[in-house]
Every structure is written in C-alpha cells, then in structure tokens.
Amino acid sequence: MKKVILIADDSPTIRKFVSFSLTMHGFEVVSASDGMEAMEKLPAHKVDLVITDLNMPNLDGFELIKSIRGNEEYKDIPIIILSSLSGSEDVEKGMSYGASSYLVKPFDPKRIHYEVSKYLN
C-alpha cells in the first residue's frame, strides 16, 4: 500500500513539482492550497506525512502544525516544513510548534525525498 503525503502550499507550481517528484518515488500525494483545506483533507485520507509551507492564506503553516499536533488522531504524523522563511527564528518557531524537519526554498527534490524517507521507511 502506498504511503500518503499531504502537501499544503499556496503555490500551484510548488505543489505540482513536489507532487510529481514524490509520485515518481512511489508515494500517493494529496494537495491543499492552504492550511484550512489541509485540515479538511486529513480525515478523508490516511495521511502518513505532511509537507507544509508557512506563508499561506486562511490558516498558515504554523497554525496548521498546531492544529495537527493538538488533534489526538493526527498528533504523531511527521510534518516537514518547506518554506522560503530561512531565519533562525522561523526555524526555531516551526520546530517548537512540532515540525519534524525544516527545509528552505529553493530546494533540491532529492533532499525532500531523503527527508520523507527518514520518516516513512
């Protein structure tokens, strides 16, 4: 059975690129354009890992992480932040909210696959 990854990013280009890369490695990918849509999609899919941007409308990545970590059913899902915010305070905040890893855009697709594989293999 394929592992399911939920990608939350307001950029259609990023969602398509990451989805294509992960699909080529045998993962099933579910996409959301913001944190609110991501939270709506969690119950409909057995999500094994979340990749999220931080700057998104409606519900940003920080709030998405807090919502996932605060939900008994989803609290143990690994969460990888993929963001253009590269300051140490952003990394610290993301990790303190419960992120498992933090990757900075622009990114190497091999690095995303490596990070995903750490949690799903």
Where are these regions (language model features)?
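Active-site beta3 strand of CheY-like receiver
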Residues: 45-51
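Short hydrophobic/Thr-rich beta-strand motif most characteristic of the beta2 strand and flanking loop
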Residues: 26-33, 41
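Charged docking surfaces used in two-component/phosphorelay signaling
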Residues: 16-24
